[in-house]
From Swiss-Prot:
Family: Belongs to the Bfd family.
Record function comment: Required for mobilization of iron from the bacterioferritin (BFR) complex.
Originating organism: Salmonella typhimurium (strain LT2 / SGSC1412 / ATCC 700720)
Residues the record lists as binding [2Fe-2S] cluster: C4, C6, C39, C42
Cofactor note as given: Binds 1 [2Fe-2S] cluster.
Gene that specifies this protein: bfd
Domain of life: Bacteria
Entry protein name: Bacterioferritin-associated ferredoxin
């Protein structure tokens, strides 16, 4: 599903970037993929996808 229509960023691309780069903030994620830098309507959904993927990662499950 497309999250950012302006830049053609899908939830899969966000999840892939989270797994590869382990960003700890949305600003860090934006260094790796161009999400939320045009109209900004996708920021909330992109953050939700990022947080969901972070909580699915094994190293974060052990901490929780």
């Amino acid at each position: 599903m497309y999250v950012c229509l302006c830049n053609g960023i899908s939830d899969k691309k966000i999840r892939q970037a989270v797994r590869q780069f382990h960003p700890q903030s949305f600003q860090q994620l934006r260094k790796f993929i161009p999400v939320g830098n045009q109209c900004g309507k996708c920021i909330r959904a992109a953050r939700e996808v990022m947080q969901d993927e972070l909580t699915q990662m094994p190293e974060f499950k052990e901490i929780a």
